[in-house]
Amino acid sequence: FMNWRLYWMFSGGNVTENMIHQIAWIMSALDLPLPSAAYMSGGIFSEKDGREVPDTMSVTLDFPETVVTWQSTFNNRRYGLGQKLLGSDGTIEYVAGATDMVKGESEEQIHYYPEKVNRPNGVAITGNSPTHNHMQNWIDCMRSRKTPNAPTELGYRSAVAAHMANLSYRQKRRVTLEEAKAFQPEY
């Protein structure tokens, strides 16, 4: 079945397909625990193809000392893929370009832009993404028994955040971690 991703029975939509990976980067950088609450709003505004999962969404994840937001839409590619970590000392931006289908590589870069108010002498930096060789890191860690760049615990926390977001969307309300733990699906 080609478009299984469009239906709740088979998929969590773009939240479990993409947000889970993008949120992992932020959760890792900030060493965040499980979110205490999640809220997701959105709808089917662009892709009128019979899908059940939203094509446009905005997710807010509450953590003890910060809030993380994630947005996605299928009807505008102006800003491409990427994440921005906005802090009082500056912004770290992870930019993912299109994958070269011949080389199997994507143009990924990380940029740091200092916040001039708090870091007047800060210097902007551009570097390569540490996830560029993500699969190679995973294979190397199987051989060496070292911890991979994206350990299992990080995947778990990211998955919980994604499922909380979808639960919020489907219930049309903010969902706490405790409510998500107690949730029993009807199927």
Which residue ranges define each predicted feature?
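Contiguous beta-strand/loop segments that form the cofactor/metal-binding neighborhood of enzyme cores
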Residues: 1-12, 16-153, 159-187
